Amino acid sequence: MPTDRDKGPEDRWRPAKGLILGVDLDGVCADFYGRMREIAAEWFETPVESLTEEVTFDLHEWGILTPAHYESLHRFAVTQRDLFKTAGLIPGARKYLRKLSNEGVRIRIITHRLFMHHLHRAAVEQTIDWLDHNGIPYWDLCFVRDKEQVGADVYVEDGPENVKGLRESGCYTICFANSTNRSIGEPRAESWDEVYQLVKRYAATSGAAARRHPAAIMEGGKDEI
């Protein structure tokens, strides 16, 4: 009967194997604010350098003062500039998601991009195109507002209200740091390398993967792209 001594390092017990990682897109994987800044500069006919990179969630720093104003800009960005397809990749996202996937973590992409009426088809198509183009591995793609409903073991999220809501629901949530969430406490990650370390630490200390997904640990799995 094979023993650990007979196995290669990649086959030995990996505490993260079978763990479900719920990952937000905008501000975590996709550089939503960087791309929106470029589009907003075009919208306002102003140099992009005149729009600060230090923004809060509602973007009022750029002169967007009402929900209707935000909706107009957002609709233009999605329908005329393919916002969700053309946003850049946050450094490290692909590298560390693929690394986690190869270690047996099940990547569950969770986004609330369907919050505006009559943009659902564009949002879904652009999202899938972006994920494929950037080589992001995932098992599931969920468009949902109440993210705790998807049942992940660990969440990576940047929206301050989303982080608060997930934590209040008892979900272990890593806050991906940016200017919109400076008031949010630990656990925080300034980079995807830090996300990776926090996920591994959680898996090693909680045993969540072993408790919730014994079949995955026994049989393994591979994320689809």
Regions found by a protein language model. Give the residues of each.
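Active-site neighborhood of HAD-like aspartate-dependent phosphohydrolases
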Residues: 2-69
